[in-house]
């Protein structure tokens, strides 16, 4: 594996020239074409004034042009600020101002979104910070125009992911070319990619989850299938027609794809579907997967460590397969290690004890862009990343993720995974979905349940409470049930995330008025 994207893609263009690199529903590009087109794009970018050290805001959906821009930027020595296509003027302004973007690439007509109108809402003084803007049509013109190649830049911080910023300003998580390539190689090895591998990338490339899906295949010479706009039906069709072997997606999307399958043969080439638990627990996912003959495994990752950082093993020789369907996993890089720490005493914990998960991995970020102090605080003195996640270790290579530490509940002197209570609440009559948080009441922490009702259901809090007390330890039974039309959310690159901090504020306000 080379240390720069240019060298790696150049090698693949020589060894796999005719193999499809990126496959879209109505077009495709092979490895030689992708390499040549990215070279031309880099030369045109440089001709337009793009310089090493500049930052490029990449505001495109999944597709060939997204990949071309990344490779071109890497060749010049530019840092790509990946921008979610769902972003609006406030977020775009933040990318330009705090992210220091000097160039912007966007697709004005994508998905019926008025990108030019969104930009018009960004203050003129902020847009003036840009050296230039390019549309998708500009890119398509550039890659077809012959031009002299430019020299390839050395390894540098080439790509940032934006954290979701549910409780603070988003951070720009920076990764180097060599770090991305090293992790991609580990992913390809861990999932046993071979000459027949074809990976479906449904999550946005702008997020760590989608990018790791892309890079693990593409940078190792395997085909990647993607589309700019996806739904369960279109993804099912791509899986069937493109002989997809692997895909990694959120659990809700995988369930939708499996539900609409016409026959098991739709998935005859599939070797593994990896799922991340972005949605509340979906037990029917495993039944649908079994009915369709699709192997499933739980995943784990983050922007700081890269996604597909861990996957539960399917082979008993590699770890405990009894937790196959739980998030977390066996660490993908062979030299990565995991441990758990008590968040209150700071003592390291033994296997099976819940605490904050800490991970040591070569896939770690280079830092937070322009925030060295924040990056320093993210790691222990011996290099482990403080994930902020609650979980327990099976070994120093495998663990189970339970919840975000901020979401974990300290009840009755114990750390409690809210999903344990939520599962019980969601089985109550009339409850469609539940979120449980803790608040302070009568000198102790107590759980509060927020619920969304099933259609035509009527709230029954007294019955719900007695049922919970029958099925759970008393300290886990919610002291209050609050009915909402919908949970407060924030959009991230991979999913819509429920704002637990907002629910905690609401819960405390309720408890403050409770006798």
Regions found by a protein language model. Give the residues of each.
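Conserved AMP-binding/adenylate-forming core of the ANL superfamily
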Residues: 2, 10, 18-49, 54-63, ...
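Conserved AMP-binding A3 loop
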Residues: 30-32, 158-182
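Structural core segment of the AMP-binding/adenylate-forming
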Residues: 47-48, 75-144, 148, 455-457
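AMP-binding/adenylate-forming catalytic core of the ANL superfamily
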Residues: 87-94, 104-108, 247, 361, ...
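Conserved AMP-binding/adenylation subdomain of ANL enzymes
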Residues: 181-198, 206-246, 260-261
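Gly/Ser/Thr-rich phosphate-binding loop
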Residues: 244-249, 258-322, 337
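Conserved ATP/PPi-binding loop(s) of AMP-dependent carboxylate-activating enzymes
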Residues: 330-337, 345-378, 416
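Conserved C-terminal "lid"/linker of ANL adenylate-forming enzymes
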Residues: 409, 435-440, 448-450, 465-515
């Amino acid at each position: 594996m080379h240390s720069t994207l240019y060298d790696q893609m150049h090698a693949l263009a020589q060894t796999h020239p005719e193999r499809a690199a990126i496959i879209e529903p109505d077009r495709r590009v092979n490895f030689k074409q992708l390499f040549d087109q990215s070279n031309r794009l880099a030369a045109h970018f440089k001709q337009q004034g793009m310089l090493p050290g500049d930052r490029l805001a990449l505001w495109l959906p999944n597709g060939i042009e997204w990949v071309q821009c990344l490779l071109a930027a890497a060749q010049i020595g530019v840092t790509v600020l990946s921008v979610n296509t769902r972003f609006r003027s406030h977020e775009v302004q933040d990318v330009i101002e705090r992210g220091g973007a000097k160039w912007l690439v966007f697709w004005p007509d994508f998905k019926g979104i008025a990108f030019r109108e969104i930009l018009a809402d960004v203050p003129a003084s902020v847009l003036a910070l840009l050296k230039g803007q390019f549309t998708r049509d500009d890119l398509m013109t550039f890659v077809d125009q012959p031009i002299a190649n430019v020299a390839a830049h050395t390894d540098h911080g080439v790509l940032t992911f934006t954290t979701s910023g549910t409780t603070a300003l988003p951070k720009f998580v920076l990764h180097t070319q060599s770090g991305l390539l090293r992790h991609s190689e580990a992913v390809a090895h861990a999932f046993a990619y071979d000459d027949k591998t074809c990976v479906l990338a449904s999550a946005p490339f702008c997020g760590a989850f989608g990018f790791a899906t892309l890079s693990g295949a593409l940078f190792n010479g395997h085909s990647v299938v993607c589309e700019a706009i996806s739904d369960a039906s279109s993804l099912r069709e791509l899986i069937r027609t493109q002989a997809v072997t692997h895909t990694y997606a959120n659990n809700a999307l995988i369930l939708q794809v499996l539900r609409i399958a016409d026959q098991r043969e739709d998935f005859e080439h599939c070797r593994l579907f990896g799922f991340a638990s972005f949605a509340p627990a979906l037990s029917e996912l495993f039944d649908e997967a079994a009915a369709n003959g699709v192997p499933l495994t739980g995943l784990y990752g983050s922007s700081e460590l890269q996604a597909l950082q861990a996957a539960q093993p399917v082979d008993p020789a590699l770890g405990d397969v009894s937790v196959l369907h739980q998030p977390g996993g066996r660490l993908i890089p062979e030299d990565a290690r995991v441990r758990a720490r008590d968040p209150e005493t700071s003592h390291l914990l033994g296997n099976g004890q819940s605490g904050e998960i800490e991970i040591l991995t070569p896939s770690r970020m280079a830092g937070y862009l322009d925030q060295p102090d924040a990056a320093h605080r993210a790691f222990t003195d011996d290099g482990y990343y403080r994930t902020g996640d609650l979980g327990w270790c099976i070994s120093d290579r495998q663990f189970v993720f339970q919840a975000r530490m901020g979401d974990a509940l300290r009840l009755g002197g114990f750390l409690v995974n809210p999903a344990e209570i939520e599962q019980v609440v969601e089985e109550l009559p009339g409850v469609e979905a539940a979120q449980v948080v803790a608040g302070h009441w009568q000198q102790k922490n107590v759980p509060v349940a927020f619920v969304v009702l099933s259609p035509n259901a009527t709230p029954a809090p007294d019955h719900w409470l007695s049922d919970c007390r029958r099925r759970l330890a008393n300290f886990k039974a919610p002291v209050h049930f609050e009915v909402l039309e919908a949970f407060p959310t924030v959009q991230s690159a991979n999913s819509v995330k429920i704002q637990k901090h907002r629910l905690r504020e609401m819960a405390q306000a309720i408890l403050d008025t409770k006798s």
